[in-house]
């Protein structure tokens, strides 16, 4: 069946749904009914932009319609256009990956250059989800956890919460039930636990990240490479309910495995160890080993009761921090020894320098005193040679 043509009214309905949280909670039929009364009150000038956009959309659809030659093959120009779009998508993905790597390297190198690498703070995050849409990358979040980490202190703080999205994607109830029963075992909506206000939850997460990383900075979080798409989708799900968003609160999600690789190299550099044999394949393999699956007390109460510790978001968020501690343990000790030796050498150098300065000052004082005494002696000798004395009147 041929696709329906766009019209100005439906363009208005779609825009209203995108811009209003109330509209995003409505079905299409409910939104059409609600917008109908608004559309009736609009004059020709107000409707003009929407009618114009509809005409442009219809024209663009006609241009995109594939033309076939006599053999039923796609036109060469259209094939080249499709290949161009694929190349563009690949370039954007490559640029995004390079930007992630450069930013991660800059964070670690800046801390190293300021001699504060062991106090540099990183935030690790994890989500659990109820279900995923079949044809898109939309995930319905069920639980969120984050932890603040530094090499010196380890896990500094933890933020975790369950999420009640209110509803499951239509037709996905069975998938959500299967996912819950085989992983986290959390109750499904409408009986889900946790925060119901998605905008409030998103602001709470931003406040926690700002507290960890400081005001005026783009929030940067780290998660395992295979979870980056899911974490980004869950953040978008929470953000879309916030009508006050202006794009300034965007959270950047980076690869924690690349962070581990860079940390290993720079810590070895500070410790004076050879880092030529370190490669990302080795650090990735180590990261995927689970050393804490049977550690008690690191999951929430519900997951502990249901013996589902391994799938809880808090545990998923804490595991990277524990893994980094294990992997960098011996290297960190070497780095601390080097830093301690440097501090000892610096203290000894300062003490030696202080003694030299005191010695020079004492020598200068002695020379000044000797010079003064010599001057007085010479002055007295001059008076005696002339047969005069400063106290005798002739």
Swiss-Prot record:
* Gene that this sequence comes from: mael
Classification via InterPro entries: HMG_box_dom_sf, Maelstrom, Protein_maelstrom
**Keyword field:** Cytoplasm, Developmental protein, Differentiation, DNA-binding, Meiosis, Nucleus, Oogenesis, Repressor, RNA-mediated gene silencing, Transcription, Transcription regulation
Q: Where in the cell is it found?
A: Cytoplasm; Nucleus
Pfam families (alphabetical):
Maelstrom
General function of this protein:
Involved both in the piRNA and miRNA metabolic processes. As a component of the meiotic nuage, plays a central role during oogenesis by repressing transposable elements and preventing their mobilization, which is essential for the germline integrity. Repression of transposable elements is mediated via the piRNA metabolic process, which mediates the repression of transposable elements during meiosis by forming complexes composed of piRNAs and Piwi proteins and governs the repression of transposons.
Q: Which GO terms describe its biological process?
A: germ-line stem cell population maintenance; male meiotic nuclear division; negative regulation of DNA-templated transcription; oogenesis; piRNA processing; regulation of miRNA-mediated gene silencing; regulatory ncRNA-mediated gene silencing; spermatogenesis
Q: Which domain of life is it from?
A: Eukaryota
Q: What is this protein called?
A: Protein maelstrom
A GO MF annotation of the entry reads: transcription cis-regulatory region binding
Q: Which organism does this sequence originate in? A: Drosophila sechellia (Fruit fly)
Quote the biased-composition stretches of kind Basic and acidic residues, using this chain's numbering: 73-93
Per the record, which residues fall in region Disordered?
A: 44-93
- Protein family per UniProt: Belongs to the maelstrom family.
């Amino acid at each position: 069946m041929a696709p329906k043509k766009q019209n100005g009214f439906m363009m208005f309905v779609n825009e209203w749904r995108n811009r209003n949280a109330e509209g995003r909670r409505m079905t299409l039929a409910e939104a059409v009914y609600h917008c109908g009364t608004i559309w009736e009150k609009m004059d020709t000038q107000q409707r003009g932009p929407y009618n114009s956009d509809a005409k442009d959309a219809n024209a663009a659809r006609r241009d995109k319609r594939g033309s076939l030659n006599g053999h039923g093959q796609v036109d060469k120009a259209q094939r080249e256009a499709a290949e161009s779009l694929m190349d563009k998508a690949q370039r954007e993905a490559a640029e995004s990956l390079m930007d992630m790597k450069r930013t991660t390297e800059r964070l670690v190198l800046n801390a190293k250059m300021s001699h504060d690498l062991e106090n540099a703070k990183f935030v690790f995050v994890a989500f659990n989800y109820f279900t995923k849409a079949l044809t898109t990358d939309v995930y319905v979040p069920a639980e969120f956890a984050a932890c603040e980490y530094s090499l010196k202190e380890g896990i500094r703080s933890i933020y975790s919460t369950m999420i009640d999205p209110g509803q499951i994607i239509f037709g996905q109830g069975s998938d959500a039930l299967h996912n819950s029963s085989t992983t986290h075992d959390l109750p499904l909506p409408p009986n889900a636990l946790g925060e119901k206000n998605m905008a409030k939850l998103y602001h709470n997460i931003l406040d926690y990240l700002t507290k960890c990383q400081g005001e005026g900075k783009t929030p940067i979080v780290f998660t395992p490479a295979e979870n980056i798409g899911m974490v980004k989708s869950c953040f978008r799900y929470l953000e879309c309910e916030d009508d006050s968003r202006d794009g300034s609160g965007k959270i950047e999600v980076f690869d924690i495995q690349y962070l581990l690789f860079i940390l290993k190299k720079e810590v070895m550099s500070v410790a004076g160890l050879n880092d030529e044999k370190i490669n990302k394949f080795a650090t990735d393999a180590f990261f995927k080993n689970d050393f804490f699956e049977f550690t008690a007390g690191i999951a929430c109460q519900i997951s502990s009761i249901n013996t589902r510790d391994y799938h809880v978001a808090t545990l998923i968020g804490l595991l990277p921090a524990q893994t980094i501690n294990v992997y960098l343990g011996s290297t960190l000790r070497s780095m601390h020894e080097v830093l301690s030796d440097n501090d000892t050498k610096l203290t000894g150098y300062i003490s030696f320098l202080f003694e030299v300065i005191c010695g020079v000052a004492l020598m200068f004082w002695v020379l000044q005193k000797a010079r003064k005494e010599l001057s007085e002696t010479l002055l007295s000798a001059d008076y005696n040679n002339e047969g005069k004395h400063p106290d005798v009147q002739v």
